[in-house]
Amino acid sequence: MANILKKIYDNDRRELKKFEKLATKVESLADEYEKLSDEQLQAKTPEFRKRLEKGETLDDLLPEAFATAREGAKRVLGLYPFRVQIIGGIALHYGNIAEMMTGEGKTLTATLPVYLNALTGKGVHVVTVNEYLSSRDESEMGQLYKWLGLTVGLNLNSMSADEKRDAYNCDVTYSTNSELGFDYLRDNMVVYKDQMVQRPLNYAIIDEVDSILIDEARTPLIISGQAEQANSEYIRADRFVKTLTEDKSDDDADDDEDHGDYKIDWPTKTINLTNQGIKKACEHFGLKNLYDIDNQVLVHHIDQALRANYIMLKDIDYVVQNGEVMIVDSFTGRVMEGRRYSDGLHQAIEAKEGVKIQEESKTQATITYQNFFRMYKKLAGMTGTAKTEEEEFREIYNMEVITIPTNRPIARKDLPDILYPTLDSKFEAVVKEIKERHAKGQPVLVGTVAIESSERLSKMLDQAGIPHAVLNAKNHAKEAEIIMNAGQRGAVTIATNMAGRGTDIKLGPGVKELGGLAVIGTERHESRRIDNQLRGRSGRQGDPGVTRFYLSLEDDLMKRFGGDRVKLFLDRISDNDDDKVIESRMITKQVESAQKRVEGNNYDTRKQTLQYDDVMRTQREIIYGERMQVISEEKTLKPVLMPMIKRTIDHQVDMYTQGDKKDWRNDQLRDFISSAITDEETTKKLNIKHLGAEELKKRLYKIAEDNYAEKEKQLADPEQMLEFEKVVILRVVDERWTDHIDAMDQLRQSISLRGYGQLNPLVEYQEAGYRMFEEMISDIEFDATRLFMKAQIRQNISR
C-alpha cells in the first residue's frame, strides 16, 4: 500500500514539475503580450486557428494561447491569472482534475484551457451544478471569449430546440450537467436529423467535479412518457380475445383450413392468430388490413391480450391479491412484491382479471452521469476536494487529481473535534460557541448534514436572540447572495452541505483582525470530502480562519461505526456525566477511519453500478448508432431492410422445420407466412408440405423482393420510398427499445435474488441481458418485416 501511495505521490510531483515548466513559458510571454494593442491581441485568435489548420497541435499553441487569454482577462475582466492558476489551467487542458482550494479562482483558471480548446471550433462545454452558476459564469467570463473573437452560448432548460442548437454550435457553451445529459437522450429520440441540438461531445470542464461525477454518479437521467396505451384499449382487446377459440388441430392434418382463431406453440410459449382469427379481428374492429402501419398499437394489444388470456395461468404465473395482479417467482413459488411484467402484459392480465388497470410511465431513454461524461473525447474537472476520491477518478474516468499549490500559504486553524455524550449537550455547546464569537463580531458559518439539524439549531438561536440566515440548498440565486455576505462582521449563517456551493465567502472590513470566518461543523459527514468542503469555506487566499467539528455519540456516523469503543473511552476518562466532553485527536482519527470505511463501501457500490450499467451502455450505443444511420440515410434503406426480412424468414422457417418432415409445425409456419409475408391465397398456393426448408426460403425471398419492387413502383418518388422505409424501422426500433429498457430494469431488480449458491449476480445479469438484447433484435426484425410486407402504401407518409 505504501508503495502505491508513493508511486501516486511521485507521479503527482512529476506532473506538477512538467506543468511548472510550461507555466514559466507562459509567464515569459507576459511583457511581449502586454505591449500588443487590443487589435493585435484579438488578431491572435484567427492566427491560432490558421496554424491549427496547417497541422500544429493545441499542445504546440498552449504557451501563446494561455498568454493571450491571460492578457485578455486583464484588459476585459480586470483580473490577471496568477502562476498557480496557469498551472491549474494546464492540468485541465491535459484532461486532469485540478484540486484548487476555495477562493483560488477556479472560474478564472478555466478561461485559459477553455480558450485554447475552443480554437478547434469543435465546442467546449463548461459544466456547472445549477443554472444560476451557468448564467453567472457565462455573463462574466463570456465577455472575455467574445472579446477574443469566440462565440459563447448558454444552454438552459427553458430554451427551445432552436435556441439550444444555437448554444451548442458556439465555440464555448455553458450548461448544467443534467441539461447536457437530457439533451443527449432527446437527440437520440428524434425522427429527423435536423431536430438534433448537440454536436459530437468534444471537451468538457466540470466545475465541482466531485459533486457531479461522484455524489451524483449513480443518479440515472430518465426520460419517461406515460405509457401511450389507454386503459380502454386493453379492455377492448381483452373483450375481443375472449370471443376466440383455439385451433387444436394437429400439424399433420391434411387440409389447409383453420380449425380455430389462434394457435399456441407451447414449447416456445408463443401464440398467434390464424387467418380465421385475423379475419375476425378485421370484422370486429372494422379494419381492411390488421397489419397496416396505423394499426401497430392495436396489434400489440391483441398480442398481449392473447398471451394474458391463454398462456399466462392464474395461480401459477400470477395471483390476484387485494385487487392486484402479483407475479409468482417460478423458481421459489413466492409472490414478488412490487414487480410488474413489462411491455403492457401486466395491464393485459389486469384487464383479463377485471381488476383496476394501473397506469405506468414508460422509460423511453436513460443514462447515468458516469456513462454520459465518459463519452467526451477529453474530460477535465475542478474542485476544492478530490484527493480523497483519487482512486475512483483514476479507475472510472481515467483522470488524475493534481493538487494545485495555493497562491498564499494557508493560515486557517483546524481544531480537533469535540465529542459530547448526547445531541442535546452537543447543540447547547454549539449555541454557546456561536454566542461567544457573535458577541465580538466574528462571522460564523455553521454546517449541518441534514435539514432537521438546521431547523433545530435555528430555533435554539432564535431563543438565544441571535439573528441568523438559514440555507437549505433550494433557492440557488438567493443562497449565493446570503453566502456572499456570510463573511461580514456579525453574520451567522446555517447551511446544509451543498448550499451555496460555487460562491466565495469574502471577509468584510475588520473581520481579519477578529480571526476571520469561524466554521462550525455540527456533525461529521460520512465522506471526508464533504467535511473538507466545509472547512475550505474559511481561510481563502491566505485569510485567517478557524474550523471545528462538534460531535455526539448519538450522531449517525458514531452510532454506525466505533460508537461503543468511544463510549468506553469516554466513561474511563470522566466520572461526572455533565463533564463528559473530550477534545482529542484520537476522536478525530477514530471518526476518519469510520469515514474511510463508508467511503470504501460507497465506492464499491458506485463501481458495481457502473459494471451493471456498462451492459446497457454497450446496447444503447448499438441501438443509437443504428438509429443514427437510419435518420442520416439520404438514398435508400433497402440494404438495411432486405437483410432484416431475409433473416426473419430464415429464423422462422428454421424454427418450425426442425427434425424430420413429419415433425414440422406446418400450421405455425403457415400462420407466420400469411400474417407476416403475404396473403392467405398465396400461402395456400405455396403448398408448403411438399417443399424442403431451403426451397421454401428461396420462394419467400422472391415474394419479399417482388413486394419491395412493387412498393418502389407505387412510390415512384425515391424520397417518399425512403420516408416509408424510415417510418417502418423507427417505429419498430423505438417501441422495442423502450420495452427492452423496461425489461432490463426488471431483470436488474430480480437478479439480486438469484445471487445464491455459486452464481455471480453480475455475470447472470450480463448473460441474461445479452440474451434479451439478441431477442429484441430478432423482434425488431420480425416486426419490421411484418410492417413492411403487410403495409398498404399511402402518399402522405410521415414519421
UniProtKB/Swiss-Prot annotation:
Superkingdom of origin organism: Bacteria
Family annotation (PROSITE patterns): SECA, SECA_MOTOR_DEAD
Primary location group: membrane
Keywords assigned by UniProt, alphabetized: ATP-binding, Cell membrane, Cytoplasm, Membrane, Nucleotide-binding, Protein transport, Translocase, Translocation, Transport
Membrane topology: Peripheral membrane protein
EC number assigned by the record: 7.4.2.8
Positions contributing to ATP binding: 85, 103-107, 504
Catalytic activity line of the entry: ATP + H2O + cellular proteinSide 1 = ADP + phosphate + cellular proteinSide 2
GO molecular-function terms, A-Z: ATP binding; protein-exporting ATPase activity
GO biological process: intracellular protein transmembrane transport; protein import; protein targeting; protein transport by the Sec complex
Stored InterPro entries: Helicase_ATP-bd (IPR014001), Helicase_C-like (IPR001650), P-loop_NTPase (IPR027417), SecA (IPR000185), SecA_CS (IPR020937), SecA_DEAD (IPR011115), SecA_motor_DEAD (IPR014018), SecA_preprotein_X-link_dom (IPR011130)
Compartment(s) of residence: Cell membrane; Cytoplasm
Any GO CC annotation of this UniProt entry: plasma membrane
Keyword Nucleotide-binding: yes
Enzyme type, top EC level: translocase
Protein family per UniProt: Belongs to the SecA family.
Task performed by this protein: Part of the Sec protein translocase complex. Interacts with the SecYEG preprotein conducting channel. Has a central role in coupling the hydrolysis of ATP to the transfer of proteins into and across the cell membrane, serving as an ATP-driven molecular motor driving the stepwise translocation of polypeptide chains across the membrane.
Complexes and interactors: Monomer and homodimer. Part of the essential Sec protein translocation apparatus which comprises SecA, SecYEG and auxiliary proteins SecDF. Other proteins may also be involved.
Protein name, UniProt field: Protein translocase subunit SecA
Protein encoded by which gene: secA
